[in-house]
Amino acid sequence: MNDPFIVALDFSSGKEVRTFLQPFSHTSLFVKVGMELYYQEGPAIIHSLKEQGHRIFLDLKLHDIPNTVKRAMQGLARLEVDLVNVHAAGGTRMMEAALEGLEAGTPNGARRPYCIAVTQLTSTSEQMLHNELWIGRTMEETVLHYAALAKQSGLDGVVCSAKEVPLIRKHCGEAFLTVTPGIRFADDEKNDQVRVVTPYEAKKLGASFIVIGRSITRAENPIAAYERLQQEWKGEEKK
């Protein structure tokens, strides 16, 4: 998984996805399929994207009792996607069960999907962490604790804000994947995410992968927006 860009397909239908991807017909993308799209289209959208040569992050954020997560992951592994995730808040036993399910469900000769854990959603503020979730630690402490649990459980990495990447790399190692949503161009609106950075800032902070959605999918010219993403990652933004 060398390409650091993951394009979030935040659509509710396969038709919208096909319309968006049409200009990319000769490009293999790394795309994210989330709840909205998967719950509407099911496994068919995964098969379609794979046939087009795209790599897939299936972003369903599983969080349930260990046995349920194990069986769910066993089924998802058969789709042969590249990356799946769980909520770290489910605990070590649940995360270990997720890996067991992936190992059991991965077809012979195939590589099991990478599995990462969500630490805290990028829509979660420090105030929300304390006042609504009743977590009495700082955001940084909470994220690091969850990342450590994910590593202890054998997971391949975490989903986190880019601002938390340096701390996670320090404590969990350079090989531990950091997948960072909340990526916006400098002139974009933040929308419902509060812990956001630009592509180049994420690179400087050491992110393994960045997830970017509306900045590309809602752009008037998605190809130009994707090229801008590549330029910003290199620190070569056009003026």
Swiss-Prot record:
The keyword Lyase applies. It catalyses: orotidine 5'-phosphate + H(+) = UMP + CO2. Pathway: Pyrimidine metabolism; UMP biosynthesis via de novo pathway; UMP from orotate: step 2/2. Substrate binds at residues 10, 32, 59-68, 122, 184, 193, 213-214. Pfam families: OMPdecase. It is an enzyme of class 4 (lyase). Its EC number is 4.1.1.23. GO terms for cellular component: cytosol. Keywords: Decarboxylase, Lyase, Pyrimidine biosynthesis. GO terms for molecular function: orotidine-5'-phosphate decarboxylase activity. It comes from the Bacteria. GO terms for biological process: 'de novo' pyrimidine nucleobase biosynthetic process; 'de novo' UMP biosynthetic process. The active site is at 61 (proton donor). Transmembrane segments: none annotated. NCBIfam families: PRK00230.1 (NF001273), pyrF (TIGR01740). Homodimer. Belongs to the OMP decarboxylase family. Type 1 subfamily. Catalyzes the decarboxylation of orotidine 5'-monophosphate (OMP) to uridine 5'-monophosphate (UMP). PANTHER family: OROTIDINE 5'-PHOSPHATE DECARBOXYLASE. This is Orotidine 5'-phosphate decarboxylase. It comes from Geobacillus sp. (strain WCH70).
